[in-house]
Amino acid sequence: MQFPESWLRTFVDPQLTTDELSHALTMAGLEVESLRPAAPPTEKIVVGRVLEVVKHPDADKLNVCQVDAGTGATLQIVCGAPNVAPGIKVPVALVGAKLPPAEEGGAPFAIKLSKLRGVESQGMLCSARELKLSEDHSGLMILPEGTPVGQDIREALNLDDTVFEIKLTPNKADCLSVFGIARETAAITGAPLAAPDIRPVLAELTETLPVKISAPDLCGRFSGRVIRGVNARAKTPHWMVERLERAGQRSVSALVDISNYVMFELGRPSHVFDLDKIHGGIDVRWGKRGESLKLLNGNTIELDETVGVISDGAQVESLAGIMGGDSTAVTLDTTNIYLEAAFWWPDSIRGRARKYNFSTDAAHRFERGVDYSTTVEHVERITQLILDICGGQAGPVDDQIVSLPQRAPVSMRASRANRIIGVEIGEDEIAQIFTRLGLAFERDGDVFRVTPPPHRFDIEIEEDLIEEVARIYGFEKIPARPPVAKSEMRATDETRRSVHAIRHALAARDYAETVNFSFVDAEWERDFAGNDNPVRLLNPIASQLSVMRTTLFGSLVGVLRHNLNRRAERVRVFEAGRVFVADPSVKAGELAVEGYAQPKRIGALAYGPVVEEQWGTATRQVDYFDVKGDLEALLAPVPARFVKAEHPALHPGRSARIEVDGHAVGWIGELHPRLMQKYELPHAPVMFEIDTDALVARALPAPSEVSKFPPVRRDIAVVVDQKVEVQALFDEMKKALADDACKFVQRVALFDEFRAKSNTSGGLSAHEKSLAFRVTLQDAAGTLQDETVDQAIQTLVDRMARVYGARLRG
C-alpha cells in the first residue's frame, strides 16, 4: 500500500513528525517499508508563464519563447516541446538550476546560459520526466492556471511531500485505502478522524438499468446508476493526478482516474461501463464452460462455472470483482455510462485472478473483504466527482441486497487478554481501545462482546480481539520479562518413549528426516489412499496443495522423486507428521476440530542399494524384508504381526498390515507397480506407515538371568500348501510355547523357502512349498537333553500338522 503523507493528513493530522508517524504505524502492525520524497532534490526551478512563441530562425523543431518567471525581466528560452503555446504555465529551470540526474546515481544536471543554433537560451522549460515526477515525456508539464508565477516549483507542486509504502499483512484488508490507514492512525494516536463528506447526488434522470443477481453466493449486494451526457475527454484535475501517481497509479482518462481515485481513497473498487455498449440488462452470475471474455488488458480468457461474471443479453461483459471486459470499456468518445459498485463474497473472488496468471487491485481487495455497508455511499462519491469533472446527469441509485455477512459477536475475556499480553490492562482502558477502533461492544463483568464492523473481516475469534488490544495499547509498553517457571524434576514414564527418541532411532538406522506440507495434491490422495473425498482447503496456497493428506506415502514418494531428479541413487527418508481424517465422532476441543481426527504417524521409505557401494560387499536392491527388519527393531521388544493385506498404494503381493496386540497400527510393502510406472520410478521403493502411539508405548524392561549353559539349535523343514502364510505358522508355534514341552524354546526364525520347479522336484507337489525354520532352545538351570529337545520340536511340528496339514520334509 503506497500513498502520500499529505493525502493521509487530510483525514487525520496527528501532532507527529513524519518519522514519528512512521514509527507509530509500524509498532501498531502496519509496517512502513520505506519513506521517500515525492520528488528528488531540485534548485531554482519556478513557475513561469509562456508569453510568446515564435519559430527558431535556424531550426524547424525549435521555438523561441518569451517567458515570465517572476524574476522581473522576461526570459528568452529555446524549447523543442510540441505542446508549448502562449499562455500556459510550466516549470522553468533558471540559469544555475539543478535538475535530477538522468540516471540514478549520476550527477545533477546544471542549467547554464547557452546558445542553441545561434539563439541565446536563458533557462529551460521542463517536462514531468525531467523533474522525475513521472515517465511522461510527451511534452511540457502544464501547470494549473491558478498557480502563482515565480513560485518555487517544490512549493507549487508540494514536492516535499513524503510517500509512505506500507507492507500490510493479509488480514488487514481494511487498510487498503488512505481512509483505512487514517482510521488506524486515529485509533493509534488518538487524533480526530475527519470522515469524507459524502452527500447524495440529485437524480436528474429516472432511468435505471435492469439488474439480475442470479448468484447470491457470488454477489451479496449490487449498487449502480446511469449517468448520461458525460465528457470523457475532460482533463483529470492536477490534484487527482498527483495523488494517483504518488499512490503508484498512472493517469489514464478522467473516468478511469475517478474510479481508481475512490478505490485508493476509500478502498472500494468499482467499474464504469459504456452504457451504449450494454445489450439490455445485466446478469450477475457464475460463468459457463465454453464462454470466453476479452479483458481490458487485451487477454482473452476461457471461462467456467468457478468464476463469476457480469453479462448482458448478448455476451459476458466483465470478470466479476477482478477486471472489466474490452467490449464495454469506456473510451474518449463515451457519453453515457453505467457506474457499478458491489459487494463480492471473498471466497468467490479468491484465487480467480491467479487462475489466469495475473492480479488486479480490485481482486486483491475483494478476495480479502471490502465493506459491504457502503456501496451506495461510494457510488455517490464517484458520481459527484464525475459530475464535477466530466459533467452529465445522474439517474437514481439502484441498490440490490440479496445476501450479506451475518457478523456474530465475538467474546473476549479481559483476564485472558491480560494473561496472554503479559501486562495488566484495565477494563476501562480496554473499553477505550475498542471505542477508538470503532468496535461496538457490550460488557458483562470482564467479558467484552464485540460485534465486528462491516469493514473488519479479520475479527472472528477471541485472539483477534486480544491482538487489537495489544497493538493499540502499544507493544513498546509491554515490559520484556524473562519467562519464569518452576524448576522441578518430573518422574519419567518408563512405559512410554518420546517421538524424539523414535526419530533418533530411525536416524541411527540410516534414515534421513524430511518435513512436508500437510496439504497435498488431490490426485495424491486418490493414488496413495484411494480417497476420492478428502478434506478440502477453503483457501489453498496452490491448486496442487488443495487437500489435507490422510497418508504419508504420497509425501515420501514426492521426496523420493525430488531426490531422483537430482541423480540420487540411494534414498532412505522418514517423516513424523499428522494426517487428517474425517471422523464424526471427534468433538471440538482445545487441540481438536470437530469431525476431524488428526493422528500422528511415522512413515519411512527406502530405495536403491541396501548399503552404500563398497568393494567387499555385493550390491543388491533394498527389499521388503530389509525394511521389515528396520520396523521390527523400531518396535522391539513389542512383537508385531505382519498380515497379508492390500493397500491402494502398495504391491498386492508384497504388502502387509501391521498388527500389535491384535490391533491394526499400520502398513508396510513395496510401492504398487501402477504408481511406480505413473511416477516414473526405475525401482520400487519399500515403505511403511505406522501410528505413533504403537511406537511410543513400551513395556517396562524385566531383567532375566543370563544362562550359563549353551543354547541348542535345531533346523526343521516342513511342507505345506503354497496358500499357507508363514505368519500363520509362526502364530501356531507361538501358541505352542504355552505347552510345557516347549517352555525352553527361545526363538523360531525362518531361514529358507523352497518351491518345486516341476511336479516331482524335491519330493514336492506343484502346489506345495518347503519352509525351513531354525529353533533355538536354552535352559538357564542346566544343559538340555536330547529327549527334551526332541519333544519340543515334535510338539511344534504336531501343532502345524494338526492345523495346516504340515509334514516334515524327508
From Swiss-Prot:
Signal peptide residue numbers: none
Domain B5 positions: 405-480
Gene Ontology biological process: phenylalanyl-tRNA aminoacylation
Domain FDX-ACB, chain residue ranges per copy: 707-809
UniProt KW keywords: Aminoacyl-tRNA synthetase, ATP-binding, Cytoplasm, Ligase, Magnesium, Metal-binding, Nucleotide-binding, Protein biosynthesis, RNA-binding, tRNA-binding
InterPro entries with a match to the protein in the record: aa-tRNA-synth_II/BPL/LPL, B3/B4_tRNA-bd, DNA-bd_dom_put_sf, Fdx_antiC-bd, Fdx_antiC-bd_sf, NA-bd_OB-fold, Phe-tRNA-ligase_IIc_bsu, Phe-tRNA-ligase_IIc_bsu_bact
Cofactor(s) demanded: Mg(2+)
Pfam families recorded: B3_4, B5, FDX-ACB, tRNA_bind, tRNA_synthFbeta
Gene3D superfamilies associated with the record: 3.30.56.10, Bira Bifunctional Protein, Domain 2, Ferrodoxin-fold anticodon-binding domain, Nucleic acid-binding proteins, Phenylalanyl-trna Synthetase, Chain B, domain 3
EC numbers, comma separated: 6.1.1.20
PANTHER family linked: PHENYLALANINE--TRNA LIGASE BETA SUBUNIT (PTHR10947:SF0), PHENYLALANYL-TRNA SYNTHETASE BETA CHAIN AND LEUCINE-RICH REPEAT-CONTAINING PROTEIN 47 (PTHR10947)
Subunit and partners: Tetramer of two alpha and two beta subunits.
Family statement drawn from the similarity comment of this UniProt entry: Belongs to the phenylalanyl-tRNA synthetase beta subunit family. Type 1 subfamily.
Protein name (database record): Phenylalanine--tRNA ligase beta subunit
Species: Burkholderia mallei (strain ATCC 23344)
Gene (name only): pheT
